[in-house]
Amino acid sequence: MTQTAHPDTVLIVDFGSQVTQLIARRVRESGVYCEIVPFQSAEDGFHRLKPKAVILSGSPASTLDVGSPRAPSVIFESGLPVFGICYGQQTMCAQLGGKVESGHHREFGRAFLEVEKDCPLFEGLWSLGSRHQVWMSHGDRVTALPDGFEVVATSSNAPFAFIADEKRRYYAVQFHPEVVHTPDGAKLIANFVHKIAGIKGDWTMSAYRAKAVEAIRNQVGDKKVICALSGGVDSSVAALLIHEAVGDQLTCILVDHGLMRKDEAANVVAMFKEHYNLHLLHVDASDRFIGELEGVSDPETKRKIIGRLFIEVFEEEAGKLGGADFLAQGTLYPDVIESVSFTGGPSVTIKSHHNVGGLPERMNMQLVEPLRELFKDEVRVLGRELGLPDSFIGRHPFPGPGLAIRCPGGISREKLEILREADAIYLDEIRKAGLYDAIWQAFAVLLPVQTVGVMGDGRTYEFVCALRAVTSVDGMTADFYHYDMEFLGRAATRIINEVRGINRVVYDVTSKPPGTIEWE
């Protein structure tokens, strides 16, 4: 699906910061559409998007290095408002006649700004003489301002922490307003797009839904669409949106690989058939998948087997339907953003969903990707707009290879059943304790280790179950969830008493980094 037109767009020029996506999230949260474009193609992006405002991101680069990233001159010649963040401030000053020097030491962490001058960006937020927490992360610093700029706020280590040329509507900060450690940062960004750029903030999921439905109809016409429905939020929302647009021209195929959570496939099929009247084929291919996976211990080999078999099964089922012209995919905006290397050219990274990778080319189909402009949290809002229940929308992430990567070592039917039961009990206890929504992801892992235990009067030699729970904002970093010991004792007791094959339960207290959330 081609991207829909947005008359009020903010262009974010990405210089390679690890938190550029957070800038986009803050702009979107204020009801304004934005796109991230790497600095190498920013001029093309500027002409394509015709933005109402521009934000320049941070970067690990130094403006003092030869060949360091720069904003295209067309941005400063356009008369549009510009907001520079950290490196964005430095390159703005360097390009407009100011001076940037290497700092004697990096400034990283919490700092406090003092407002030196009233500024339109502070309206309803900060007042003259007030003091506010921000988050710094920089080495270089501005030491002389370009003509027309003045200081509006300072910190003890950054005399040019917040500068402005109000006549040209240029604003620039040395700190990071996009991160949660700058409490008023989201409001500053909202003030920039609303009060400075004059954008209304009427970009909503309701409006997106209407435009997306129209775009799908225009793209698909009277042709057939098939969708690989995994039971996850992304593919489910994509399927409902396409179904709203083209109705029975859509057929969904759920390939059950036998690696889902307890009763998951049956529950997904029931929900979509009973409540949404979708044409849905449930293909039980568990024997085929588990037969090939049995005894395989290498995690990458497991993933490759699952991906290959999925394509084979999906192709077979699509062939029985007589084929289709379009393949629906739940691609999200982070999947299609170009990753930026500030030392060389852009390297485009498009994550292929393990389920559908390679299918469009193999089956000679065009892609329909109605979610490719959205972040995950926006997909959840759209899902609610389409009528999906919160109990479904708010489910924890689940990996495409399913329980195969939560069963380290060789897989067997017996192990999968043991794991499935333990996982169901663990999640049940989390829900009973009212903790489910406070946790980003929770699951059980069946370890390829057996230990001696005593149950009744007998000796046991059974598997160890590890419990995992993490808190996170986006899955990029995570901390283990701090349960109280009473909860862990209760969950462990239930698992040992109710699941034959487990006689010991441990809790994983590893954060990410250094560990990953999943064990494989």
Curated annotation (Swiss-Prot):
The gene is guaA. Pfam families: GATase, GMP_synt_C, NAD_synthase. CDD domains: GATase1_GMP_Synthase, GMP_synthase_C. Its EC number is 6.3.5.2. Signal peptide: none annotated. Pathway: Purine metabolism; GMP biosynthesis; GMP from XMP (L-Gln route): step 1/1. Homodimer. Catalyzes the synthesis of GMP from XMP. Residues 9-202 form the Glutamine amidotransferase type-1 domain. GO terms for cellular component: cytosol. The active site is at residues 86, 176, 178. It comes from Sinorhizobium medicae (strain WSM419). SUPFAM superfamilies: Adenine nucleotide alpha hydrolases-like (SSF52402), Class I glutamine amidotransferase-like (SSF52317), GMP synthetase C-terminal dimerisation domain (SSF54810). Keywords: ATP-binding, Glutamine amidotransferase, GMP biosynthesis, Ligase, Nucleotide-binding, Purine biosynthesis. It is an enzyme of class 6 (ligase). This is GMP synthase [glutamine-hydrolyzing]. It comes from the Bacteria. It catalyses: XMP + L-glutamine + ATP + H2O = GMP + L-glutamate + AMP + diphosphate + 2 H(+).
